[in-house]
């Protein structure tokens, strides 16, 4: 999101960055997020999750929507204590057990354009933005990843977060 780029006072990189979340990070909508011992900085990031519906490899941005089964909401929690330790890989930061709650459902035939995304923490609004302010839209993300990685049904892509995610 443009708001996140501005928040960190950085220039937009030439391409999005991605990281892997192991299946053990996946959690249900009302599942318990487990803060590991010695974790001081547990960060929230409300995101729209793209769910792949059929095998996808080397597709164009224009074709990408044909491979999306639907969308859900997710919280991309992160253990920011490990941010420097992992030197950019984000595996421990984002991949720890239970840190990726998704759901409660999937919407299909949904146009992601011009939609509001909001993150609440204990009932208080913390993040708010419009999907039209994404630096790279949902179809771009699918096509970009599928240039080098085969996506299969059930794969999920967390699409990025607006400004104001904090531990």
Task: For the regions a language model picked out, list residue spans one by one.
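A generic local secondary-structure boundary/capping motif
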Residues: 6-9, 33-42, 56-63, 90-94, ...
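Extended, compositionally biased flexible segments
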Residues: 1-44
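Short, conserved beta-strand element in jelly-roll/cupin
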Residues: 19, 49-54, 102, 150
């Amino acid at each position: 999101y443009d708001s996140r780029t501005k928040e960190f006072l950085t220039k937009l990189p030439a391409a999005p960055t991605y990281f892997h979340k192991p299946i053990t990070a996946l959690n249900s909508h009302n599942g318990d997020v487990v803060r590991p011992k010695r974790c001081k900085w547990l960060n929230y990031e409300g995101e729209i999750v793209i769910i792949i519906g059929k095998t996808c490899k080397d597709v164009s941005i224009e074709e990408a929507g044909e491979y999306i089964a639907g969308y859900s909401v997710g919280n991309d929690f992160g253990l920011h204590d490990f941010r420097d330790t992992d030197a950019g890989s984000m595996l421990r930061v984002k991949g720890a057990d239970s840190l990726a709650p998704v759901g409660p459902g999937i919407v299909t035939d949904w146009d992601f354009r011009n939609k509001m995304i909001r993150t609440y923490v204990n009932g208080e609004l913390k993040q708010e933005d419009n999907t039209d302010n994404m630096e790279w839209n949902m179809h771009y993300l699918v096509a970009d990843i599928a240039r080098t990685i085969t996506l299969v049904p059930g794969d999920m892509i967390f699409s990025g977060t607006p400004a104001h995610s904090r531990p």
